Design a protein with these regions (language model features):
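Short hydrophobic/aromatic-rich beta-strand segments that constitute the beta-sheet cores
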Residues: 34, 54-56, 93
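Histidine-centered metal-chelating micro-motifs
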Residues: 32-34, 38, 71-82
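A short glycine-rich, His/Asp/Glu-containing loop-to-beta-strand
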Residues: 1-41
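Short acidic-glycine-tyrosine-enriched beta hairpin
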Residues: 58-78
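Short glycine/proline-enriched turns and hinge-like loops at secondary-structure junctions
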Residues: 37-39, 46-47, 66, 85-87
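Glycine- and acidic-residue-biased ligand/ion/polar-headgroup-sensing regions
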Residues: 40-58
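Short, surface-exposed secondary-structure edge patches
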Residues: 24, 44, 64-65
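Double-stranded beta-helix
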Residues: 2-6, 84-117
């Protein structure tokens, strides 16, 4: 198990194999992840505690889904998305193992660009 500090909070990687990865993302209230998509990575998100808004789709037609404890969303490759913490929130993420597959479209912390395989 390892902890990775992020500008929006931290993540704990609790499982990492050649076939899947399990993480807990702790996002501090008022913080947001980058607007991003993945070319290959597929992930399922479940809110463990707290509330967040999940933005889905391109900026000109974004859907905002309020997610609370127990809510689940499946993110397919190519889906533009961003998590925004309404309160401190813990999100369980289970995904395919392509952790560096991130295409950032917008980032308030200055991490613009692509980390795609």
């Amino acid at each position: 198990m390892r902890r990775v500090d992020k500008p929006w909070g931290y993540e704990i990687v609790w499982a990492e194999t050649a076939r899947y990865v399990g993480k807990v993302l702790h996002i501090q209230a008022g913080h947001r992840l980058s607007r991003q998509y993945h070319k290959v990575k597929e992930e399922t998100l479940m809110v463990q505690d707290g509330e967040m808004d999940l933005e889905i789709g391109p900026a000109e037609s974004v859907e905002i889904r309020r997610m609370k404890k127990g809510d689940v969303f499946h993110v397919l490759p190519g889906t533009i998305h961003r998590m925004i913490a309404v309160t401190d929130v813990d999100v369980l993420e289970v995904s395919t193992p392509e952790l560096d597959d991130v295409v950032r479209l917008e980032d308030v912390y200055g991490r613009q660009g692509t980390n795609a395989p």
